[in-house]
Design a protein with these regions (language model features):
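Extracellular low-complexity, Gly/Ser/Thr-rich intrinsically disordered linkers
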Residues: 317-494
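Short alpha-helical segments and helix-capping/turn motifs at coil-helix boundaries
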Residues: 133-150, 238, 257-260, 318-322, ...
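Extracellular hydrolytic enzyme modules, especially secreted metalloproteases
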Residues: 157-358, 408
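N-terminal module-boundary/linker segments of secreted carbohydrate-active enzymes
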Residues: 22-65
């Protein structure tokens, strides 16, 4: 069935099993480009073909994931994905670039599917949507094999890139293109449920999982941009890159559990982890690293358990810089130090504030411009951001993150993607420094919505939101103890 996460609709099925995994080494990706029969429907974005030149609003050198979306462009997207996972796993996991291939081999080629785009995600026809998405995956693989005899056994993961935008974001208005294709992780259960087969047989190879992704997440490249964003003060601020969605989908494929409620779409760890809202940090080109728990689960880090009553210096996030504090035999805290600085003491927001203040105007430079000009990111010749010096740049602040982990909840719910299903009983819970449990709850604040996480959730000296919850701490370092808000109370009240 379809599941959603506030800003996206995706399909999730499958089992995970244990409380640890060995997500190491590298994987080879088979990328298949597919297009649709041409159409001029208003319910989908684009014509059904890949974008070879921009048709929308010109953001000049600040364009995210610019056209042409040809073979080189998708190779750059795979390089960006590799840079992300190499960085956040400390070189323990990544993409085998040499062993990954984009098909077909021609620069502007694609495999033409038998229907228009809207067939594969018909509006309000919930009873057939999942089956049609599965058919898209099946038809893409079969068509590619028929035309190019691809040896799928040479690859670890199949990624179908389709023409058009993903049906993955909530917009601040009625969605004008509801029949765009949702980004999807397809696994064996989904194939079995919809095709009545254990997998898709191609020659002697059985394919039982894969990913479906759009060519872009940037609406501003398409002719619909003017009607959608033409009245915005700065339309270019509505751009998003593909890397975040790509990393999220690959996260599922390699076994990282989702950390939001996949049935309601409600956030649980917000912008502070890849497997929730953090996939779209930094306008989708700087996704957040997985949470401390996820990195330990993947085998990328081993936490340090300090002696009782000891004092520790906690460096910035790096391999081995997670502290584990036991609470009970099943519960413990994981503490990490995260920084969104582009250079010591300087964040993207502080640069914007300084430039705006010095200009004596009421406006500040756009986030997207400062992100691309001043954060040290690297764009390649295809205009894709392929390297980022620090994937914490997209966080709302710098400081400690304190995670409350309950292995009993995790072990009983991980098989059904339910680690954080119940907001009142979560396996991985962020101790929000402002003393409130905002993440995942509906917000009454129109402009400063904390329900996905904000600066006040991080632990740092000078956090005004912490002081509001703990007035006696004004001027002092924040403290986390039995009499603070939040407190160190265990889930059973001890």
């Amino acid at each position: 069935m379809f599941q959603s996460i506030i800003h996206r609709s995706i399909i999730l099925v499958g089992l995970l099993g244990s409380l640890s995994a060995e997500i190491i080494d590298s994987i080879k990706i088979c990328a298949i480009r597919v297009s649709f029969n041409e159409d001029d429907l208003v319910s989908t974005t684009g014509s059904g073909n890949f974008l070879l030149e921009s048709e929308g609003i010109d953001c000049d050198s600040y364009t995210i994931d610019p056209a042409p979306h040809d073979k080189d462009y998708f190779e750059s997207q795979i390089m960006a994905l590799n840079s992300y996972f190499r960085s956040v796993s400390y070189e323990k996991f990544g993409i085998n670039i040499e062993g990954s291939v984009v098909f077909p081999s021609s620069q502007n080629g694609s495999y033409k599917l038998s229907n228009t785009m809207n067939y594969y995600n018909p509006y309000i026809e919930n009873d057939v949507q999942e089956r049609r998405i599965t058919e898209l995956f099946q038809e893409s693989i079969i068509t590619a094999y028929q035309e190019d005899s691809i040896n799928f056994s040479s690859f670890d993961l199949i990624v179908v890139f389709h023409a058009g935008i993903g049906q993955d974001f909530s917009l601040p208005f009625l969605d004008p293109t509801p029949e765009d294709i949702p980004s999807t992780y397809v696994d064996q259960k989904m194939i079995s449920d919809n095709l009545n087969e254990a997998g898709i047989t191609i020659g002697e190879h059985l394919i039982d999982r894969g990913i479906i992704l759009p060519e872009s997440q940037n609406h501003l490249l398409y002719d619909i941009a003017e009607s959608m964003f033409g009245d915005a003060t700065d339309p270019c601020e509505y751009q998003y890159g593909l890397t975040g969605t790509f990393a999220l989908m690959v996260g599922f494929a390699i076994g990282l559990p989702p950390l939001w409620n996949i049935e309601s779409g409600e956030s649980r760890v917000g912008v502070f982890g890849l497997m929730d809202q953090g996939s779209n940090n930094g306008r989708g080109i700087i996704p957040a690293p997985p949470t401390a728990w996820s990195r330990i689960y993947a085998g990328w880090e081993v936490p340090v358990e300090p002696d009782f009553n000891s004092e520790m210096y906690l460096p910035l996030r790096d391999d081995g810089n997670i502290i584990k504090i036991p609470i009970t035999d099943q519960e413990y805290y994981l503490i990490e130090n995260r920084s969104n600085h582009v250079r010591p003491g300087v964040s993207i927001d502080s640069i914007r504030y300084l430039i705006g203040t010095m200009s004596n105007s009421d406006t500040y430079p756009s986030y997207s411009e400062i992100l691309q000009d001043s954060s040290g990111i690297e764009k390649d010749i295809n205009g894709v951001v392929v390297s980022v010096p620090n994937y914490d740049i997209g966080l709302p602040a710098s400081g400690l993150l304190i995670w409350h982990i309950d292995d009993a909840i995790i072990s009983s719910s991980i098989d059904g993607y339910g680690i954080n299903h119940d907001i009142h009983s979560m396996g991985i819970d962020l101790e929000e420094a402002d003393g409130a449990q905002d993440i995942g709850h509906q917000s009454i604040f129109l402009f400063n919505d904390p329900s996905s996480g904000y600066f006040g959730d991080m632990w740092f000296r000078g956090n005004t939101q912490y002081v509001l919850a703990n007035p006696s701490s004004e001027g002092l370092k924040p403290e986390f103890g039995p009499y603070t808000y939040p407190s160190t109370q265990s889930n059973n009240g001890a």
